[in-house]
């Protein structure tokens, strides 16, 4: 194995010193400082070396801190003024005569906080002019002993106060040591020969004939290099982009709707009763302003009739929910709790002629639930849903489409089990199999109930399904906590693989 000259120089330091661990200073005799880390990184990639990093935190006095040690804290200046002038009190309004403008307010606040003074009729009275100040003493100590590790928990609390006052700042220093491995020790048992190398054959080398004498370093495409993290899209954005591409390739068109919806569109049109638990404040975000919205009057009458008695004009669809429907509730505004509202609005917009055609649409967007934040719940997340409206589609078609969709997302093993949703019948849940995790629920689906479709004058079956994209992202990225998707952890974002199937 041929090593770079810088790698050889670094290993020679271990050979000559017979040490297993050497710090950066110990290598300077053999290799230039700016080349140490590059050579060490290469040797680490060859398993010849380990890099040991130790991070230390050191405190540093700011200009304010240095002035405080030389001239005293602002509160000490006040007490010294009283001692010098043999006064027992001092008017608050005259603080600016003793202190700088930016010191006066802080001095008074700290005198009261430290319980060194009492305030009477606008005058400051010191309990004792000969007082001890822990902050002053600690600041002097820090000027002599800056290593943070040398301080107790109580002292660190005081240090935090000194930092807030602008007297101190914290610096982090990384110290590195280099440890040779067993493989590296085997290598240095042999003589280490360092030849003059050239990386580029120049005209002068050719003309002079020196190219015959020098060692030309071979180009090694496999040599370890520093990792580079180029700019890339957020993993959640890539998931959304991928799902959009999959659905578009399957013949779906994308539709959108507003974030703020009336309860009519969000709940009533989906045949969800007005006393359903999902519609209370524990699950839904109600909008304060505007708190009501416009509802299409004729459609409202039809939906109301469906809810109350299951009828559209004289046509009996079902029993309905058998309760008194409140039109004012329908007008209240909410943050949408699902993207199905986009499909419902799309269906309601179809003309009689358009209802005769074949329709495949989907929506990917943010939805909102009044959830308690934990490892699997957020109040805001992305959802994807879609519908297919056609004359002869059936439950079997729905299962086939879902399996194709999940297969294109990389899930080969899919199983279907029965489920219940208020606005579809029959309904199903699809589970996918993941190695090491078993079967996991991923999406819900079904066929829209007649009570949902009849108010729009739609007689054809409509297949519907929905999937939480945050759940999909967790499975694909191997996350156990949904909050990790939105932490903006730069290290995680840099190292996360842009989605692979």
From Swiss-Prot:
Binding locations of L-phenylalanine: 340, 423, 448
Chemical reaction(s) catalysed: tRNA(Phe) + L-phenylalanine + ATP = L-phenylalanyl-tRNA(Phe) + AMP + diphosphate + H(+)
GO biological process: phenylalanyl-tRNA aminoacylation
EC number assigned by the record: 6.1.1.20
Keyword set, alphabetical order: Aminoacyl-tRNA synthetase, ATP-binding, Cytoplasm, Ligase, Magnesium, Metal-binding, Nucleotide-binding, Protein biosynthesis
GO cellular component, one term: cytoplasm
Location(s), subcellular: Cytoplasm
Molecular function via GO: ATP binding; magnesium ion binding; phenylalanine-tRNA ligase activity; tRNA binding
Cofactor descriptive note: Binds 2 magnesium ions per tetramer.
Cofactor or coenzyme needed: Mg(2+)
Keyword hit for Nucleotide-binding: yes
PROSITE patterns named in the record: AA_TRNA_LIGASE_II
InterPro entries reported in the protein's UniProt record: aa-tRNA-synth_II (IPR006195), aa-tRNA-synth_II/BPL/LPL (IPR045864), Phe-tRNA-synth_IIc_asu (IPR004529), Phe_tRNA_ligase_alpha_bac/arc (IPR022917), Phenylalanyl-tRNA_Synthase (IPR002319)
Broad enzyme group: ligase
Residues that, per the record, bind Mg(2+): 425
Stored Pfam families: tRNA-synt_2d
Family classification: Belongs to the class-II aminoacyl-tRNA synthetase family. Phe-tRNA synthetase alpha subunit type 2 subfamily.
Subunit structure: Tetramer of two alpha and two beta subunits.
UniProt-recorded name of the protein: Phenylalanine--tRNA ligase alpha subunit
Source organism of this protein record: Methanococcus vannielii (strain ATCC 35089 / DSM 1224 / JCM 13029 / OCM 148 / SB)
């Amino acid at each position: 194995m041929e090593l770079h000259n810088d790698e050889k120089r670094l290993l020679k330091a271990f050979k000559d010193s017979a040490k297993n661990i050497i710090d950066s200073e110990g290598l300077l005799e053999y290799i230039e400082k700016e080349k140490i880390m590059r050579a060490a990184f290469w040797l680490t990639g060859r398993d010849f070396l380990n890099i040991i990093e130790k991070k230390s935190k050191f405190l540093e006095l700011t200009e304010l801190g240095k002035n405080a040690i030389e001239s005293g804290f602002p509160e000490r200046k006040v007490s010294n003024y009283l001692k010098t002038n043999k006064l027992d009190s001092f008017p608050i309004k005259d603080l600016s005569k003793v202190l700088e403008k930016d010191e006066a307010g802080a001095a008074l606040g700290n005198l009261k906080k430290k319980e060194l003074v009492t305030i009477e009729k606008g005058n400051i009275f010191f309990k004792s002019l000969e007082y001890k100040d822990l902050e002053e003493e600690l600041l002097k100590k820090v000027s002599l002993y800056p290593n943070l590790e040398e301080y107790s928990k109580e002292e660190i609390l005081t240090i935090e106060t000194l930092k807030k006052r602008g007297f101190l700042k914290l610096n982090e220093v990384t110290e590195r040591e280099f440890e040779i491995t067993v493989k590296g020790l085997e290598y240095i048992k042999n003589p280490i020969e360092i030849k003059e190398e050239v990386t580029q054959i120049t005209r002068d080398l050719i003309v002079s004939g020196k190219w015959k004498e020098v060692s030309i370093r071979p180009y090694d495409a496999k040599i370890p290099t520093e990792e580079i993290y180029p700019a890339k899209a957020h993993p959640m954005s890539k998931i959304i982009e991928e799902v959009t591409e999959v659905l578009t390739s399957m013949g779906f068109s994308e539709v959108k709707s507003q974030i703020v919806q009336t309860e009519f569109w969000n709940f009533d049109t989906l045949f969800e009763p007005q006393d359903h638990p999902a519609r209370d404040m524990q699950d839904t975000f109600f909008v304060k302003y505007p708190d009501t919205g416009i509802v299409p009057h004729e459609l409202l009458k039809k939906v109301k009739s469906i809810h109350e008695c299951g009828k559209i004009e004289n046509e009996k669809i079902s029993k309905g929910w058998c309760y008194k429907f409140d039109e004012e509730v329908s007008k209240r505004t909410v943050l949408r709790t699902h993207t199905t509202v986009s499909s419902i609005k799309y269906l309601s917009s179809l003309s009689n002629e358009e209802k005769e055609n074949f329709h495949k649409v989907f929506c990917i967007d943010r939805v909102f639930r009044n959830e308690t934040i934990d490892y699997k719940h957020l109040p805001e997340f992305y959802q994807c849903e879609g519908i297919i409206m056609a004359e002869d589609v059936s439950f079997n078609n729905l299962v086939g489409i879902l399996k194709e969709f999940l297969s294109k997302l990389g899930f080969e093993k899919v199983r279907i089990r029965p489920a219940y949703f208020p606005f579809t019948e029959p309904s199903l849940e699809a589970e996918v199999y993941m190695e090491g995790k078993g079967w996991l629920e991923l999406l819900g689906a079904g066929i829209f109930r007649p009570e949902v479709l009849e108010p729009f004058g739609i007689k054809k079956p409509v297949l519907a399904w929905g999937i939480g994209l945050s759940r999909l992202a967790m499975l694909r990225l191997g996350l156990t906590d949904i909050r990790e998707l939105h932490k903006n952890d730069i290290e995680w974002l840099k190292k996360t693989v842009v989605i692979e199937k």
